[in-house]
Design a protein with these regions (language model features):
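Short, structured helix-loop boundary elements
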Residues: 45-46, 66, 88, 92, ...
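Helix-turn-helix
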Residues: 47, 55-89, 93
Length: 174
């Protein structure tokens, strides 16, 4: 039974061939092929990012433009472009924020919860990734909506899937 659940999760989260990109630790970000330190955002920027995450989550990436984000965040367009430079960069940052939060939850479930049986951990992981109001939904939505229009941001979503697959592989080897 556990192998069936695991196989189902791997099928669900496996990237297509040729898109594999392994990350050695869960908290590293990559931008233009270079390693970046952990994402640290000022308070006002974080407010804009959280507002954009909410808008993208409920309306989609293509229906929400810079004008709507600026209006909802109550900042000027100049401030927006000073913070993010482009909508693609904002989407990429939003996905990085969601990815890091999700990775923290997965690591907490898998590595630190030693009293829970493996099958229950898999069920929790499944529930975490199928919750439409959860952290994974934006990453999942990005896979289908932004592949052609925002390829750098798309790679962020794909790196999470690759990380999750690697995490399962390492967990099985132990």
């Amino acid at each position: 039974m556990p192998s069936t659940v695991f196989t189902a999760l791997l099928c669900l989260f496996s990237p297509k061939k040729g898109t594999g990109f392994f990350i050695s630790t869960y908290n590293k970000n990559f931008y233009n092929g270079k390693t970046m330190p952990n994402l640290v955002l000022p308070t006002r920027t974080l407010y804009v990012v959280n507002k954009a995450i909410d808008l993208f989550h409920h309306r989609g990436f293509h229906l929400i433009g810079v004008d709507r984000i600026v209006k909802e965040s109550e900042i000027t367009k100049a401030t927006f472009y000073n913070y993010f430079h482009s909508k693609e960069r904002l989407i990429e940052i939003c996905l990085m924020v969601q990815k890091e939060k999700l990775q923290e939850q997965v690591v907490a479930m898998v590595e630190y919860d030693l009293s829970t049986p493996t099958i229950d951990k898999l069920k929790k992981l499944y529930d975490l990734h199928t919750d439409l109001e959860g952290l994974y939904y934006l990453l999942f939505k990005a896979i289908f909506e932004i592949k052609n229009s925002y390829p750098k941001a798309y790679q962020t979503a794909m790196r999470y899937r690759t990380w999750l697959k690697m995490k399962f592989t390492v967990s099985l080897e132990c």
